[in-house]
Amino acid sequence: MAVPARRTSKAKKNKRRTHYKVTAPSVNFDETTGDYSRSHRVSLKGYYKGRKIAKAASAE
């Protein structure tokens, strides 16, 4: 099994990890329901692309 010849410094490690960033989720306005929902997902009221495709989840 391969073993690193030298220890990776904190600076080298952090430079490598600069690309691991958290991005904000994309949110779209649904004109049918008047709510905001994430792209390519069913809204909380059961609409997708303006059509009703699922029953709305009830708060029990």
UniProtKB/Swiss-Prot annotation:
InterPro entries with a match to the protein in the record: Ribosomal_bL32, Ribosomal_bL32_bact, Ribosomal_zn-bd
Keyword Nucleotidyltransferase in annotation: no
GO biological process: translation
UniProt cross-references to Pfam families, sorted A to Z: Ribosomal_L32p (PF01783)
Keywords on record: Ribonucleoprotein, Ribosomal protein
One term of GO molecular function: structural constituent of ribosome
GO CC annotation terms, alphabetical: large ribosomal subunit
NCBIfam families: rpmF_bact
Family: Belongs to the bacterial ribosomal protein bL32 family.
PANTHER family, sorted: 50S RIBOSOMAL PROTEIN L32 (PTHR35534), LARGE RIBOSOMAL SUBUNIT PROTEIN BL32 (PTHR35534:SF1)
Name listed for the protein in its UniProt record: Large ribosomal subunit protein bL32
Source organism (scientific name): Streptococcus pneumoniae serotype 2 (strain D39 / NCTC 7466)
